[in-house]
Amino acid sequence: MMENPIKGRVWKFGNDIDTDVIIPGKYLRTKDMQVFAAHAMEGIDPGFSKKAKPGDIIVAGDNFGCGSSREQAPLALKHAGIACIVAKSFARIFFRNAINIGLPLMEADIECEEGDQIEVDLLKGEVKVSGKGVFRGNKLPDFLLDMLTDGGLVAHRKKVRDQEKEESA
């Protein structure tokens, strides 16, 4: 289930962070989420998984999640404890894969430094950065917010199906 607003410490990355950096290909044969978590961002910061704490937030530049369409990339970040990703832009398939697994994200161009505390309000489409102000982002459409609130696509479809069963009974 999604919390809102999402508050956390920033991990800052640049432009064109591809899925090979997020979770290197040599780990894709496993289905163990702890393996994914242990190797998240290994291609750019080998110690990331040991330093990241549950509730941390990634802030990045343009085209976050580009490259191959591996769904393991957002899974690795989610299981490493990342609560949200804010980027200037996302690769479309990464964006949808993140929504599908219930990993909140927002497109926004914000000013912050690694280690800053930020607050991401998905319902308002804004990010507050301690000591630096409030930045407007792209508010997600309601149907995507509903999916995130329910924990992702599968959980959302189950909820809708259960509601439909109740209504028809």
Curated annotation (Swiss-Prot):
Keywords: Lyase. Its EC number is 4.2.1.114. The record marks R29 as: Critical for substrate specificity. The keyword Lyase applies. GO terms for biological process: coenzyme B biosynthetic process. The keyword Hydrolase does not apply. Disulfide bonds: none annotated. One of its GO terms (molecular function) is homoaconitate hydratase activity. A motif (YLRT) lies at residues 27-30. It catalyses: (2R)-homocitrate = (2R,3S)-homoisocitrate; (2R)-homocitrate = cis-homoaconitate + H2O; (2R,3S)-homoisocitrate = cis-homoaconitate + H2O; cis-(homo)2aconitate + H2O = (2R,3S)-iso(homo)2citrate. It comes from the Archaea. Pathway: Organic acid metabolism; 2-oxosuberate biosynthesis. Gene3D superfamilies: Aconitase, domain 4. Component of a hydro-lyase with broad substrate specificity for cis-unsaturated tricarboxylic acids. Catalyzes both the reversible dehydration of (R)-homocitrate ((R)-2-hydroxybutane-1,2,4-tricarboxylate) to produce cis-homoaconitate ((Z)-but-1-ene-1,2,4-tricarboxylate), and its hydration to homoisocitrate ((1R,2S)-1-hydroxybutane-1,2,4-tricarboxylate). Is also able to hydrate the analogous longer chain substrates cis-homo(2)-aconitate, cis-homo(3)-aconitate. These reactions are part of the biosynthesis pathway of coenzyme B. Belongs to the LeuD family. LeuD type 2 subfamily. HAMAP family: LeuD_type2. Heterotetramer of 2 HacA and 2 HacB proteins. This is Methanogen homoaconitase small subunit. It comes from Methanosarcina mazei (strain ATCC BAA-159 / DSM 3647 / Goe1 / Go1 / JCM 11833 / OCM 88) (Methanosarcina frisia).
